[in-house]
């Protein structure tokens, strides 16, 4: 199986690579259209700001390439947020528009931002991305922006208010948390995605 991690120029490429390698796969980090389109599974990692990430995608000619993908794609953290229509960051940053929902700045509700640390994730019952993961398992988050709960939400978490922790739209999946930093539950989620 060809596993590709999209070279978005972001900082968590190596941690995602190592997490996939620990599961027995040999991922390739690439931004070459031919390699990306031939992938059986594709990871879209991202950390930092939506503006910087979209600039990187545009500079690397990846926007149309991502939208053309028909294989399963997993967006991680900012990679998931980029699947939405836009981010409220910096007055509004257009993103990929795969999921018809914006990403909004989290309201602090007296809690510190960014939301950083372990939080419980509640998936839709029986969803294949969460197969063999205990109900109410904890995953590791680092973010100040979040996608509201929407029709594509397959799991949610709460930090002052509910937000989308995972989503699915056609062949696109996204997780707001970092599975590569979430211990056994995160490893199982990556395994589930890779075995789809």
Curated annotation (Swiss-Prot):
Residues 2-196 form the Glutamine amidotransferase type-1 domain. It is found in: Cytoplasm. Its main location: cytoplasm. Pathway: Amino-acid biosynthesis; L-histidine biosynthesis; L-histidine from 5-phospho-alpha-D-ribose 1-diphosphate: step 5/9. It holds the Pfam family GATase. The keyword Cytoplasm applies. This is Imidazole glycerol phosphate synthase subunit HisH. It comes from Pectobacterium atrosepticum (strain SCRI 1043 / ATCC BAA-672) (Erwinia carotovora subsp. atroseptica).
């Amino acid at each position: 199986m060809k596993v590709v991690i999209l070279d978005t120029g972001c900082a968590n490429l190596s941690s995602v690579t190592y997490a996939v390698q620990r599961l027995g796969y040999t991922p390739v980090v690439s931004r070459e259209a031919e390699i990306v389109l031939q992938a059986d599974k594709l990871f879209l990692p991202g950390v930092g700001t939506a503006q910087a990430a979209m600039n990187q995608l545009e500079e690397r000619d990846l926007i149309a390439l991502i939208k053309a993908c028909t294989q399963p794609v997993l967006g991680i953290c900012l990679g998931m947020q980029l699947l939405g229509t836009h981010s409220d960051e910096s007055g509004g940053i257009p993103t990929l528009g795969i999921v018809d929902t914006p990403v909004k700045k989290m309201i602090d509700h007296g809690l510190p931002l960014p939301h950083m640390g372990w939080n419980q994730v509640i998936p839709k019952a029986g969803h294949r991305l969460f197969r063999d993961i205990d109900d109410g398992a904890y995953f590791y988050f680092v973010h100040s922006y979040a996608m509201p709960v929407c029709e594509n939400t397959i799991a949610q978490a709460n930090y002052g208010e509910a937000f989308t922790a995972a989503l699915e739209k056609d062949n696109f999946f996204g997780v707001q948390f970092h599975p590569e930093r979430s211990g056994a539950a995160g490893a199982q989620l990556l395994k589930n995605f890779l075995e789809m």
